[in-house]
Structures are given as structure tokens and as C-alpha cells.
């Protein structure tokens, strides 16, 4: 950058030289001193040639002088423009260098911070869980919560051979360390309605539900990669779909037991005899009505033999189907019988339930009627007692003031006795009604 700036300043200095005579005078002395001297000598020679041309053609003097006058200004502007362009490019390059340096610095700082945080997490992990060997590094840790009677907020630590959880709630430390080889199930689930945020990790004896996972899928993938034995067991325990088909094919007969050799032996003999007869007829070349009749007889005989053989061959198939059909029916009948018995039981229960319901309703109505009657009898007894009280209150003042006649006294005594008898009779009736109610209630229970 410095060299370019110096060259541009040299060019400006060259263009500021005014006179051609001085340059022509100084040219022979400084012809080999510097590149600027070479440029000046060439300019002097060009000036001499221009003068000769001007002497030959005076009309061309004015445009050449204007061009010579304008050329220094143009060269100065070009020099300034080149300076500004060089300065702008240098500034841009400096800015780009600063940006790249800042990016690299930020990346290195991030790497340093992540490595330091990972180192701190690893140290904390080994400090909490002493069962894990110190040579085994921590792969990753996740913030989550263990779901029990309450949520225990904490961290889930995953290493190569261990899955550990630690939380401290209400001053109580809960630590769970699960060896990776003891895990029998890893399942995704969700405790919220819409957010899938939970994982189930099960062993032979325990089952843990970790909720509030921010990145459940990455956690699931990491734990799945740690528990590689689960993939092997899932592949080994995959059912063979062809086993049922093979058993079905083994139970099924390969072919139907059809023996046509014995059944169609007679038919072969008839056909051979018929061929011999036809050959004899063709050799003789003459046909008589007897031969035609015999031929018809043989044809009808062969047809009857075919019909007989068909009739004999059909029963085995029907027998085979018949022997299979009863088995199928025997297999289907128990289920049908069970369904019928279940339907009958349901009908009986549906019949029994309404009868019990009606009986309970009747008992309830009777009990209500008895309760109402007892209240009514109690009301009547209270009214009678009030009347007796009023009568006695009326009779007491008359007895104090004047003695009542003997006739009236006897009548009053009779009335009191009658009332007492009626009351005792009513009380006896009430006791009977109460006993009956108790018996009905006991029977209803």
C-alpha cells in the first residue's frame, strides 16, 4: 500500500514540471539518473518534433497547445482518484479483517465457555454420583423433573453406562442411578394435553417418569443410543409371521386322496375293446346292421360304465367334505351354544331385576303409608289429651265453688273411664302397627 501511494505522488510531481526548455537542457545531464529523467527526456524529444510540425503546419498549433494544457489537469485528477480508490479499498479491507477477527474471537470464546461448562458439569456429575467411575465422561445433561407424589425438579445426567438423576427440593436430595444395561423399556409419553414432554424409563423393579423435558426427542435418541441392548432384544424378539402360515400348511393336506387307477380300470378295458372292434370294421370295409347295433350297444355300455364310475368317484369327495363339515360345525357349535346361554342368562337377569325393583317400590309405599298413619294417630291422641285437659280445668273450679250433684259426678267418672279405655285401645293398636312395621322392614332387609 505504501509503494502505490509513493508512485502516485511521483507522477503528480512529474506533471507539475512547467517548461520544456529546462527539461531539454537538463536532459543530457540526468538521462540515466532516475525513471523521471527518462520520462523528461522523452518529453523533450516529443516537444522538438512538435515544433517542427508546427513550423510546417501553422494551422495545427492551437489544438495541440490546448491538449498539452489540458493533459496535466487530467493527470492530476486521475492521480487524486487513484489515491481515493486506494484509501477506500484499504478501509474496506481493514473493516473485513476486523469482522473476521471478531467472529473468530467470538467462536473461540464460545468454544472455551462450552468446554468449561462441560468440564464443570462433568465434575459436578462425578461429585454427586460416586458409583460412576471417574474415567467415564458425561455425555450430556438435561433439565427435567421426576414425577412422583410431587414433581422433583432437577437434572438428568447421561453417560456411556449410566443414567442418573439428581434434585434438591425442600432441602431433600434425591439421587437415582440407573445402569444402562438394566433398562428394559424407554417410551415416549406426554403428561400435558398438547406438549409431548415426558419419557418413561423402566427397569425390572422400578419405573421412572421424567417430565418437563425441553428437548424430548434428543434425550430419547441419546438414551436409546446408550441402551443398545434394547435394539438387539427388539430385533431378536420379532415374531416370525410365516410360522402360523407354515403350521396352517402343515395341517392342510397336500392333495385329495383320489385314486383313479382302480376306479377307471374297467373303463380302460371297454375303450380298448371298442378300438379293436373299430379296427376290425375298418379292415373288413363293410358294415352290416348287426355291426351297427353292436356298436350302439358298446357305446351305450361304455356310457353306463362312465356314469357308474362317476357315481363311484363322487362319494369320496362328498365324504371328505362331510367329514370336514361336522368338524367345522363341532367347532362352531360350542360358541353358538355359549352365546345362547349368555343370552338366556341376560334375559333371566333382566326379568329378575324388574321384579325386585317392583317389590322394593311396594315395600317403600307400604312403609310411607304406615308412617303417615302413625303421625295421624299421634295427632289424634294429642287432640284428645288437649280436650281432656280443658274438661278437667273446667270441672275443677265448679268442684271448689259448689259440690256437684252425685248424678253429674258419676257421669263424669264414666266419661273419664270411657276415654281411658279408648286411649288404651288406641295405644294397643299403635303398638300392633309398630310391630307390623318392624316385621315388614325386617322382611324387606
Swiss-Prot record:
The modification Phosphoserine is found at residues 238, 255, 265. GO terms for cellular component: cytoplasmic microtubule. Keywords: Acetylation, Phosphoprotein. Residues 94-112, 311-330 have a biased composition (Basic and acidic residues). It comes from Mus musculus (Mouse). Residues 123-190 form the GRAM domain. The modification N-acetylmethionine is found at residue 1. The keyword Transcription does not apply. Residues 18-44, 56-68, 233-246, 281-291 have a biased composition (Polar residues). This is GRAM domain-containing protein 2B. It holds the Pfam family GRAM. Residues 1-118, 233-252, 277-331 are annotated as: Disordered.
Amino acid at each position: 500500500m505504501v509503494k502505490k501511494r509513493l508512485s502516485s505522488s511521483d507522477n503528480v510531481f512529474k506533471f507539475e514540471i512547467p517548461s520544456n526548455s529546462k527539461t531539454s537542457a537538463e536532459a543530457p545531464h540526468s538521462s540515466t539518473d532516475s525513471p523521471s529523467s527518462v520520462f523528461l527526456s522523452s518529453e523533450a524529444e516529443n516537444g522538438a518534433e512538435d515544433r517542427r510540425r508546427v513550423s510546417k503546419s501553422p494551422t495545427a498549433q492551437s489544438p495541440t497547445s490546448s491538449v498539452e494544457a489540458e493533459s496535466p489537469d487530467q493527470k492530476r485528477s486521475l492521480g487524486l482518484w487513484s489515491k481515493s480508490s486506494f484509501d477506500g479499498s484499504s478501509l474496506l479491507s481493514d473493516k473485513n479483517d476486523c469482522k473476521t477477527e471478531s467472529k473468530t474471537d467470538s467462536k473461540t470464546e464460545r468454544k472455551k465457555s462450552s468446554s468449561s461448562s462441560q468440564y464443570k458439569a462433568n465434575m459436578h456429575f462425578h461429585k454427586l454420583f460416586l458409583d460412576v467411575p471417574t474415567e467415564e465422561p458425561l455425555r450430556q445433561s438435561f433439565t427435567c423433573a421426576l414425577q412422583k407424589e410431587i414433581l422433583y425438579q432437577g437434572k438428568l445426567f447421561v453417560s456411556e453406562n449410566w443414567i442418573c438423576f439428581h434434585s434438591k427440593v425442600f432441602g431433600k436430595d434425591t439421587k437415582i442411578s440407573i445402569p444402562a444395561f438394566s433398562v428394559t423399556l424407554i417410551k415416549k409419553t406426554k403428561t400435558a394435553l398438547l406438549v409431548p414432554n415426558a419419557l418413561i424409563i423402566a427397569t425390572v423393579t422400578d419405573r421412572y417418569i421424567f417430565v418437563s423435558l425441553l428437548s424430548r426427542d434428543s434425550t430419547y435418541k441419546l438414551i436409546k443410543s446408550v441402551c443398545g441392548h434394547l435394539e438387539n432384544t427388539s430385533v431378536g424378539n420379532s415374531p416370525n409371521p410365516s410360522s402360523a402360515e407354515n403350521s396352517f400348511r402343515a395341517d392342510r393336506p397336500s392333495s385329495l386322496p383320489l385314486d383313479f387307477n382302480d376306479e377307471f380300470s374297467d373303463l380302460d378295458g371297454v375303450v380298448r375293446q371298442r378300438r379293436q372292434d373299430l379296427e376290425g370294421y375298418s379292415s373288413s370295409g363293410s358294415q352290416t346292421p348287426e355291426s351297427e347295433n353292436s356298436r350302439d350297444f358298446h357305446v351305450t355300455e361304455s356310457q353306463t360304465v362312465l356314469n357308474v364310475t362317476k357315481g363311484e368317484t363322487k362319494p369320496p369327495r362328498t365324504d371328505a367334505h362331510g367329514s370336514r363339515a361336522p368338524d367345522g360345525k363341532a367347532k362352531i357349535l360350542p360358541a353358538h351354544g355359549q352365546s345362547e346361554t349368555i343370552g338366556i342368562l341376560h334375559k333371566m337377569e333382566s326379568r329378575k331385576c324388574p321384579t325386585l325393583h317392583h317389590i322394593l317400590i311396594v315395600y317403600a309405599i307400604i312403609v310411607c303409608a304406615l308412617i303417615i298413619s302413625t303421625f295421624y294417630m299421634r295427632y289424634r291422641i294429642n287432640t284428645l289429651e288437649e280436650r281432656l285437659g280443658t274438661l278437667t280445668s273446667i270441672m275443677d273450679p265448679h268442684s271448689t265453688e259448689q259440690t256437684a250433684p252425685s248424678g253429674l259426678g258419676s257421669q263424669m267418672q264414666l266419661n273419664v273411664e270411657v276415654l281411658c279405655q279408648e286411649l288404651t285401645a288406641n295405644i294397643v293398636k299403635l303398638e300392633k302397627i309398630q310391630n307390623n312395621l318392624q316385621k315388614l322392614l325386617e322382611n324387606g332387609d
